[in-house]
């Protein structure tokens, strides 16, 4: 597992730039995809490729990454209805007043991770962290997934 291919989408870059300018950006959902896209066109994607799977948003934290201000978003993947190979992890968001979610970024791994059916492995859990490099001034919040508890110091 390398998960080295990360692309901010064209629409996602606009939302992040607006967040730096003072408009609040809410990260609304994390989604997994079973398909692969050419890395050269990931920036133009509007959704994940292949089957779509809802993932859990666990939290967001301001951090410093290689000397730059950033936000660390924590995502949890658990067993699905049916076994599948997870190749893409995406974050969606929207600005206050926007009608629809926008794909902010995609992380892709060519090999992927096999996600088992929950009926065969109820204990399976894969926690993934996405780092968004952005100014400390950006106003970014997150919608925690139902059933998640907030822990201070994440």
Model-identified regions with their sequence ranges:
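Fibrous stalk/shaft segments of extracellular and virion attachment machinery
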Residues: 150-154
